[in-house]
């Protein structure tokens, strides 16, 4: 692990680089919410948000103003401290994962030797925010939504972790930079194709995105575990979902598509391009797929994703041994 540099110049550079990357992630997440609504509008033969600014470009600003000026209401029947902690935990848990993802060989906030394990740890921590939000709201719909989300996330995190192990075995390291370096000449998408499929599907479930958005299903649970949240607290949940999409897209680019590897252009250009492509795929999936029944979604995980990860691990072991 690389700790904070000692010299004052290096320390200032490190802090500045960290702030710039995290602010860029937050801005990207905000913009993505508007891009998603515009793309969904085009695919559904309607306009989408196009009134604030040119073609709706300032819709992000309008949304932020609306959230900040809404009443910051805490239900009288809720567990207040837990109710306040839950959205902060949801926002921070996956935002911290950004710190270990390298944009290039030289642009990484924290170069952790246990990078993959750190991601899995933060992903597990995000489950607590959902469970605490549903329980502390003291609302039956919020509680049902949080139970659904917890069961779903815990189940698919098993496949998420197993799908990472093939990549780790091939790189012989949990370090993200080592994983990218191991893909020079051959990206992991080819030898780890089954692992990629399982990771991508589990990533959708981790982000609670279509078709794995049962915890927030409006028709059944009235918006799920954050039904009692408003103002900035709801905004933290809202922006946290898009941060999780950025994190999963970045990890797919890093672990399976060579990260910053690419010809001609600067290394960070290729990383950003690959990440943006997967973020767009997340949006297109939301526009294309229906919401399956909850029990079918859970069965799909254990009957399809779990065997896929096992086949991938066996295949990887055979290649490494022989």
From Swiss-Prot:
Cellular compartments annotated: Cell membrane
One Pfam family matching this protein: NADHdh
Residue ranges of the TM segments: 15-35, 81-101, 114-134, 149-169, 184-204, 237-257, 265-285, 299-319
Top-level taxon of origin: Bacteria
UniProt keyword Calcium, yes or no: no
UniProt-listed Enzyme Commission number(s): 7.1.1.-
Reactions accelerated catalytically: a quinone + NADH + 5 H(+)(in) = a quinol + NAD(+) + 4 H(+)(out)
Recorded family membership: Belongs to the complex I subunit 1 family.
Entry protein name: NADH-quinone oxidoreductase subunit H
Species name: Buchnera aphidicola subsp. Baizongia pistaciae (strain Bp)
Gene, per the UniProt record: nuoH
């Amino acid at each position: 692990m690389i700790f904070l540099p000692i010299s004052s110049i290096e320390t200032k550079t490190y802090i500045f680089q960290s702030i710039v990357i995290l602010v860029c992630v937050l801005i990207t997440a905000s913009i993505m919410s508007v891009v998603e609504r515009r793309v969904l509008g085009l695919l559904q033969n309607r306009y989408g948000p196009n009134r604030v600014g040119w073609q709706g470009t300032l819709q992000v600003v309008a949304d932020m103003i609306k959230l900040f000026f809404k009443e910051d209401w805490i239900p009288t029947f809720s567990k207040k401290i837990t109710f306040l902690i839950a959205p902060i935990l949801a926002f921070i848990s996956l935002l911290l994962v950004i710190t270990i993802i390298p944009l290039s060989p030289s642009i990484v906030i924290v170069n952790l030797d246990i990078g993959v394990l750190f991601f899995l740890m933060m992903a597990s921590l995000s489950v607590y925010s959902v469970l605490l939000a549903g329980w502390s709201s003291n609302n039956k719909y919020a509680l049902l939504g949080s139970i659904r989300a917890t069961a779903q996330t815990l189940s698919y995190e098993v496949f998420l972790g197993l799908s990472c192990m093939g990549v780790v075995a091939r790189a012989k390291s949990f370090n993200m930079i080592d994983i990218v370096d191991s893909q020079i000449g051959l990206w992991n998408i080819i030898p780890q194709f089954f692992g990629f499929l399982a990771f991508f599907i589990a990533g959708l479930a981790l982000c609670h995105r279509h078709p794995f958005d049962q915890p927030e299903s409006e028709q059944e649970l009235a918006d799920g575990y954050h039904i009692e949240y408003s103002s900035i607290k709801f905004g933290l949940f809202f922006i946290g979902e898009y941060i999780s999409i950025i994190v999963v897209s970045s990890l797919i680019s890093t672990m399976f598509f060579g990260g910053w590897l690419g010809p001609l252009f600067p290394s960070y250009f290729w990383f950003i391009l690959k990440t943006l492509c997967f973020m767009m795929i997340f949006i297109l999936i939301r526009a294309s797929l229906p919401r399956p029944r909850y029990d079918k979604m859970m069965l799909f995980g254990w009957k399809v994703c779990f065997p896929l990860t096992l086949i991938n691990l066996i295949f990887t072991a055979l290649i490494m041994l022989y």
